[in-house]
Amino acid sequence: MSPGGAGCSAGLLLTVGWLLLAGLQSTCGINVTAVQDPSLVSEGENEGEEEAENDSEVENEPQAEAEQDVSNKTVVKEVEFGMCTVTCGVGIREVLLTNGCPGGESKCIVRVEECRGPVDCGWGKPISENLESVRLSCVHTSPVNRFKYVWRLLRPNQQAVILANDSAILEVQRETHPMAFQCETLDNNEIVATVKFTVYTTAELQMKRSSRPDTDAVLVFVLTIGVIICIFVIFVLIFIIVNWATVKDFWASKASTTEIQSELSSMKYKDSTSLDQSPTEIPGHEDDALSEWNE
């Protein structure tokens, strides 16, 4: 082989070696990247999850703060209960908010709720009556059909009779003798109110109506006299307060006049006593003069 051919073959081998080495490096690089890709992906996913969690935590923090603020506001709010509309049985009352009202108001109504008092309401009055019939009403609130009603006819020394009427209103015709009725208001089979009524006869009702005007006239007369006396006393007090200086001078002059009269009466009394004593003293002096003359 010639030296030129040997040099060419050596250069060719060197070139092929470099190409093989470059191919191996590229292959290793591809494998390395192929091996590292899953880890990188997993790391990227983990980082994404961490970022999502951080974002969710950042978003949840304002929500938690808002919930805390709401809870604090609910704690600050104060509730006050109004008076019940009834003194017995079942009624309604207002629930008032005394703090945190809209518009800066001192109190505002939140809701209306049911309230209850003592069960026994005693004796009630009819809602309407005439010479022939009477209408009686049970204790209830709206809606009326929420409760159950039991009407009883009360009899002395006997068991009460349960009537067929189960409504809140009972209309009764007057009889020749007075009658007594009782209504029981039930809520979930629990008695929440009872009230009794007396239904008088026609003659008794007429007698009550005839005697009522006399009583009313006496009551009106007494009230009128009382009002007049109160007005007179008020005017006298106002006059004394307005003219206090004049009133004070008047009482002072009256007091001085009384003192002068008392002094004059005391002086007259002294003069009268001195006059009464002088005749008794004169005979004593005469006796002394006679005794001296005799000596």
Curated annotation (Swiss-Prot):
Side Extracellular, residues: 30-220
UniProt superkingdom: Eukaryota
Tissue expression pattern: Detected in spermatozoa (at protein level).
Chief subcellular location: membrane
Keyword Phosphoprotein: yes
PTM annotation: N-glycosylated.
Protein function: Plays a role in acrosome expansion and establishment of normal sperm morphology during spermatogenesis. Important for male fertility.
Subunit annotation: Interacts with CYLC1; the interaction may be relevant for proper acrosome attachment to the nuclear envelope.
Protein name, per record: Sperm acrosome membrane-associated protein 1
